[in-house]
């Protein structure tokens, strides 16, 4: 884990890696290439039980109170395991909401895994319709 700075970060990476191996085996990855995955995916509750959805969020909203570095470690392990599904975009959405307002009430459902977040990047591009 190149971004793990402390031994706790290495422990976190090891824990997430073990979770990924256990709940997202290669058969799940191959199946996800051929068929749509369940929503939420089968690993969603296991990730919630481990506190991963809210790892980077304030304890005030049910998160673990860690930061973006710890989230990056989790995302790196999910990426290394090629975990399909909405975990990464949901984590990014919750980080964006939290950056704007760390006590936003929507974060409670995201931290617990009861909700799945998404985000869209606004390019600032606009259009004007002409005609009917």
Question: What kind of region is each of these model predictions?
Answer:
Residues 1-87:
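Amphipathic, small/basic residue-rich leader segments at the start of a protein or domain
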Residues 38, 64-65, 91-96, 115:
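Short secondary-structure boundary/hinge segments and terminal tails
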Residues 49-50, 93, 125:
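A generic structural signal for solvent-exposed, polar alpha-helical segments
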Residues 85-102:
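N-terminal glycine-rich flavin-associated loop
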Residues 22, 72-74, 91, 100, ...:
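General N-terminal targeting signals
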Residues 73-78, 97, 129-132:
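DPxDG-like acidic metal-binding loop motif
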Residues 32-34, 95, 128:
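Juxtamembrane/interface motifs at transmembrane-helix termini
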């Amino acid at each position: 884990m190149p971004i793990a700075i402390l031994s706790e970060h290495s422990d976190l990476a090891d824990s997430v890696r073990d979770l990924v191996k256990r709940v997202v085996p290669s058969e799940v990855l191959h199946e996800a290439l051929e068929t749509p995955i369940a929503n939420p995916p089968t690993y969603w509750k296991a990730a919630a039980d481990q506190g991963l959805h809210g790892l980077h969020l304030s304890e005030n909203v049910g998160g673990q109170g860690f930061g973006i570095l710890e989230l990056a470690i989790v995302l790196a392990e999910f990426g290394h395991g090629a975990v399909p599904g909405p975990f990464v975009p949901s984590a990014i959405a919750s980080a964006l909401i939290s950056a704007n307002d760390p006590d936003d009430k929507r974060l409670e459902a995201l931290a617990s895994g009861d909700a799945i977040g998404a985000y869209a990047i606004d390019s600032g591009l606009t259009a004007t319709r002409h005609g009917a």
